[in-house]
Curated annotation (Swiss-Prot):
Source organism phylogeny: Bacteria, Bacillati, Bacillota, Bacilli, Bacillales
Keyword Isomerase among UniProt keywords: yes
Entry protein name: UDP-glucose 4-epimerase
Binding site for NAD(+): 11-12, 31-36, 50-51, 72-76, 91, 116, 140, 144, 168
Necessary cofactors: NAD(+)
Catalytic residues in the record: 140
Keywords for this protein: Carbohydrate metabolism, Galactose metabolism, Isomerase, NAD
Organism: Halalkalibacterium halodurans (strain ATCC BAA-125 / DSM 18197 / FERM 7344 / JCM 9153 / C-125) (Bacillus halodurans)
The protein's role, per its UniProt record: Involved in the metabolism of galactose. Catalyzes the conversion of UDP-galactose (UDP-Gal) to UDP-glucose (UDP-Glc) through a mechanism involving the transient reduction of NAD.
């Protein structure tokens, strides 16, 4: 049986595909390549298309014996979602509705969903627990929460089995340097800092240094992308054993401040990396850390690469060899 990975050419998706292949899984990838990269994929059956394409989904489910879907395909920028909410509901919610409808038509009833800790909104406690209130503060988080609720009701009505994985910031790259992180425009802190080290940016901005944290900068939960890949695989195995459906946080066990991330990047790269203090961004909480006790207990998941230094080292190794990301590879493959 095969696993269909939607959005499998994206950052977390491509690392999950690589991890699945290393476990001996047969993998089918569907991606529209708006954000993903063909150069991040090898040795898989690839479909270039959209999750809202009914006919394409029929073809995929008819052609391949698929027992589980891992669903990454989504628009995922918080700021953009505030400016373009219709697009986010269209792609994320309606897209998932189309995917789910076709899954059920073809009797595929297991799905692992890449959700987000943005479903919680402003945290009521740190670390965040799955039982905490889910009150998203932006359309991106709202769409992910709506999808989670859709899965719940489809379980009640049709026997769908699902795992929703909620996490904050993926970081790092394949430890062997085969694939890495490439967004356009780049919005994630670690690759932005590494672009400064590569001379592609003059400096990095620290948005606020007057938070109630030890060094005044925001604290965030970073998880190595291969640890996230492993979590998605373990979730598939959990569902194949008829494990309970539900939502699971994935956390590193501790958070890292913006200043701490920059300092570790300086140490790893050997570059000074100039930084400047900028005004706070609206809606940025001082600290966001997720508890992963439930995932550890039920899924058997433990981070293999919890060290910030290791995440930065793996990211730096890839960025040094691919300073312009997948641009060359994409031109060759598309």
């Amino acid at each position: 049986m095969a696993i269909l990975v939607t959005g499998g050419a994206g950052y977390i998706g491509s690392h999950t595909v690589l991890f699945l292949l290393e476990q001996g899984e047969q993998v089918i990838v569907l991606d529209n390549l708006q954000k993903g990269h063909a150069g991040a994929l090898s040795d898989v059956t690839f479909y270039h298309g959209d999750i809202r394409d009914d006919q394409l989904l029929d073809t995929i489910f008819t052609t391949h014996s698929i027992d589980t879907v891992i669903h990454f395909a989504a628009n995922s920028l918080v700021g953009e979602s505030v400016k373009q909410p219709i697009e986010y509901y269209e792609n994320n919610v309606i897209g998932t509705h189309t995917l789910l409808k076709k899954m059920l038509e073809h009797d595929v009833k297991k799905i692992v969903f890449s959700s987000t800790a943005a479903t919680y909104g402003e945290p009521v406690q740190i670390p965040i627990q799955e039982s905490d209130p889910t009150i998203p503060t932006n359309p991106y988080g709202e769409t992910k929460l709506a999808i989670e609720k859709m899965f719940h009701w489809c379980q009640e009505a049709y026997g769908l089995q699902y795992v929703c994985l909620r996490y904050f910031n993926a970081a790092g790259a394949d430890p062997n340097g085969r694939i890495g992180e490439d967004h356009s425009p780049e919005s994630h802190l670690i690759p932005i800092v590494l672009q400064v080290a590569l001379g592609q940016r003059e400096r990095v901005a620290i948005f606020g240094d007057d938070y109630q944290t030890e060094d005044g900068s925001c604290i965030r939960d970073y998880i190595h992308v291969m640890d996230l890949a492993n979590a998605h695989y373990l979730a598939c195995e959990h569902l194949r054993k008829d494990g309970q459906s539900g939502s699971f946080n994935l956390g590193n066990g501790k958070g890292f401040s913006v200043k701490e991330v920059i300092e570790v990047c300086r140490q790893v790269t050997g570059h000074p990396i100039p930084a400047e203090i900028a005004p706070r961004r609206s809606g940025d909480p001082a600290s966001l850390i997720a508890s992963s006790e439930k995932a550890q207990t039920i899924l058997g998941w433990e981070p293999k690469y919890p060290s910030l230094e290791t995440m930065v080292e793996h990211a730096w190794n890839w960025h040094k060899e691919h300073p312009h990301g997948y641009s060359t590879e994409n031109k060759d493959k598309q």
